[in-house]
Amino acid sequence: MHFDHVAVRVGNIQAAVNWYRSLFEATVIYQDENWSLLSVGDTKVALVLEDSHPPHFALRVNSQEELLEPAEHRDGSLYNYIVDPWGNTVELIYYPSEKN
């Protein structure tokens, strides 16, 4: 298991992408109307609209069996959101088509 990405809420996807690109030289990995995944150095940052995804950090797991009741993202990755006792959201994510 290792760190995969952090997701932060934004009010406007394109404005946020432009800001992260200009300030941090981020590159877009994926983007649609609800969210964008950026590469910032060795880190991935997901920009999410306020009502589309919870703010969270994601841990990449090594097998589907490590997920609790997995759901499927549009890109084919499998995930599960869990909430710690203090209200923080953690995403466990597995990429079936890649080595984790």
What spans do the regions from the language model cover?
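Short, conserved charged micro-motifs
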Residues: 15-18, 64-69
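Short glycine-enriched loop/turn motifs at secondary-structure junctions
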Residues: 1-2, 50-54, 74
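Conserved short beta-strand elements that form part of the metal-binding/catalytic scaffold
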Residues: 27-61, 89-96
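Vicinal oxygen chelate
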Residues: 68-100
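Core segments of cupin and vicinal oxygen chelate
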Residues: 1, 7-45
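Short secondary-structure junctions
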Residues: 24-30, 67-74
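A short, structure-level motif marking secondary-structure boundaries and short turns
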Residues: 1-3, 68-69
